[in-house]
Amino acid sequence: MTVIMMKQLVFFIVITVIASCGQNEPLTNYEPKSPQEQALKSILLDFQDGVNTLDAKKIESLIHPKASLMTGRERKTLSKEEYVKILPKRLAGNPFIALGKPKMTVSGDKAEVKIYMTRGNYNGLVVYNMILEDNKWYIQGWKY
């Protein structure tokens, strides 16, 4: 192996490690950088707990009334009202989830949280759109 090839290999490994940072680190280990991030982390931990304890009411309380939520392999978008109707069945039919280390962008009363979610054999990026209303953060939508 030539020196140039060796340098390229090392560079590729370093980039891969940097790109995957946070994917396997749990949300519980995330250190928020602001009170807003702390509140968002709490909402996401509550969401994770609600899914894992099959608590549809807990999840419902985290979702904004005007939410638009992506669901299923077909990536159909549902209102909160539509989603809540299918939620108990979805919870019963899916494995537990684990949320990873997030990347949060907060701007006024809106926030975007990019986070890896593991569910069974699936590990993929989910983008949560959050909204602050009456001093409380809500999930306004998500996509994957």
Protein language model annotation of sequence segments:
Residues 1-10:
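Positively charged n-region of N-terminal signal peptides that target proteins for export
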Residues 9-18:
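Sec-dependent N-terminal signal peptides
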Residues 21-53, 61:
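Short, low-complexity N-terminal intrinsically disordered segments enriched in polar/charged residues
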Residues 47, 59, 67, 83, ...:
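Hydrophobic pocket/interface hotspot
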Residues 53-66, 70:
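Short, well-ordered alpha-helical segments enriched in acidic and aromatic residues
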Residues 68-76, 91-92:
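A short gly/proline-enriched turn/hairpin at secondary-structure junctions
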Residues 81-127:
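Surface-exposed, charged secondary-structure patches
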Residues 123-144:
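Short beta-strand edge/turn micro-motifs at domain boundaries
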